Amino acid sequence: MLGRLLISIVIACMGFAGVAQAQNKAELLWYSQAAFKLTTQNGKVILIDPWIMGAPLTPPELKNLDAIGKVDLILVTHGHGDHIGDALELSKKHDVPIWAPAGLNQTLLTLGLMPSKLVPRMNKGGIIEPFPGVKITMVRAEHSSEMVLKDPASGKDTTFFAGEPVGFIIELENGFKIYHMGDTGLFGDMKMIGEYYKPDLLLVPIGGHFVMNPKDAAYATKELIKPKMAWPMHYASNPMLRGTPAQYKEAMGQTSIEILDVKPGDKKQF
């Protein structure tokens, strides 16, 4: 009798654990601009373009690198300051790699700013599987990429080549796919990216001037990529980024794509 009772308890516990695991969801926290903290279903933490401390629209309560907690991986789409942001400090602090365009990481290594183990090389079309069930693919973006850094030799601010800009397709443990576009203008291969990778969620820049404006972003979303959901980003952090979520939503018109109503500091689960 006791044996049957113990077996029943074990089976019940196994069933409960399975339900709990099935209920795990990924969580995406938006700091502002293109900076996100992605926590996967299995609890791995990925930072994307972590411009946090210097970003004017990041909520004050989030301007604390210690409050991020653990970090397992950092993705950087290109070398501009509003994307590489706090990546170097966070990489060293947590002893985790920065995955970025090969030319960007090569420059950091050549200048002696980062140890080789923290700046592995990767390029467009490259795929990494850093954790069980998680796959990250580097894809094209249409932008530029350079870094303004202090030259170790002269001590002067100097502009350095930082590879070519990219975006990332992040596939999570349950198959959910996120396409972080980085900074980009319109380009025809967005259609191929949409057809081939079939992203569920699109993180899309809408501010204009340096990236797509709301009209261009809506065309990319609705006609080329066709995700299930869209998260407008990269606007209002300086006077030239004039595009707004309202303009983007208007340009989208009637659509089955869910346009997320989000502001810096918001979290969503998927």
Task: Outline where the language-model segments fall.
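Extracytoplasmic
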Residues: 31-33, 41, 69, 93, ...
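Binuclear metal-ion centers of metallo-dependent hydrolases, dominated by the metallo-beta-lactamase
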Residues: 97-98, 109-130, 218-270
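Zn-dependent metallo-beta-lactamase
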Residues: 2-45, 52-54, 254, 264-266
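Active-site neighborhood of phospho(di)ester-bond hydrolases with catalytic His/Asp-centered motifs
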Residues: 47-49, 71-79, 99-102, 178-184, ...
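Pre-active-site segment of Zn-dependent metallo-hydrolases
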Residues: 40-81, 85-92, 106, 115, ...
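Active-site environment of divalent metal-dependent phosphoester hydrolases
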Residues: 54-55, 81-85, 105-108, 126-128, ...
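Active-site-proximal loop/helix segments of hydrolase catalytic cores
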Residues: 150, 154-223, 247
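Beta-strand-turn-beta hairpins that frame and shape the catalytic cleft
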Residues: 23-26, 40-46, 127-137, 171-178, ...
